[in-house]
């Protein structure tokens, strides 16, 4: 396709720089930027986003050295892409350390979690949701994996969503 696939560390550094660049484009009439990977001179981005100051930045992943540091600097939402509640709690602590290092209130970052749906036991899914909410999750994504059982979306709407809303309070 002609699009280079950079090594993981470089991809993440490019992401961090791109976040800076995009925020400039969305908040200034013209933007100048001279980064390691991207350069702009008197660049414009029109029309500006309707959401002010700009749409939320969502960053997912759990890499402690780069991803969570970039999240601390730029994200409005961090998405924990899966794993145990204890791993989530550890990653949140690391994120808070990165926030402290850049002078940011970690409470400004919404904590999103992807929760795998247990098709055989939807009650177990609700219990998992409860554990993540108790651990500080503020946003939940019910993660459906193929093969999808017939009627699963309706079952989730009827059996899980009302109970999840009750958990979220």
Question: Which residue ranges define each predicted feature?
Answer:
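Active-site-adjacent structural elements that line small-molecule/cofactor binding pockets in enzymes
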Residues: 1-169
């Amino acid at each position: 396709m002609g699009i280079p696939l950079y090594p993981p560390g470089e991809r993440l550094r490019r992401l961090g720089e791109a976040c800076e660049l995009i925020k400039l484009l969305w908040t200034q009439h013209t933007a100048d930027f001279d980064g390691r990977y991207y350069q702009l001179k008197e660049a414009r981005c029109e029309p500006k986003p309707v959401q002010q100051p700009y749409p939320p930045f969502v960053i997912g992943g759990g890499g402690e050295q780069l991803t969570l540091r970039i999240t601390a600097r730029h994200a409005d939402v961090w998405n924990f892409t899966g794993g145990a509640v204890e791993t989530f709690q550890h990653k949140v602590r690391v994120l808070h350390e990165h926030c402290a290092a850049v002078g940011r209130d970690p409470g400004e970052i919404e904590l999103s979690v992807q929760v795998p749906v247990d098709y055989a036991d939807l009650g177990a899914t609700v219990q998992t949701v409860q554990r993540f909410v108790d651990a500080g999750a503020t946003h939940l994504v019910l993660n459906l994996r193929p093969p999808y059982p017939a009627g699963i979306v309706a079952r989730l709407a009827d059996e899980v969503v009302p109970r999840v809303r009750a958990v979220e309070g």
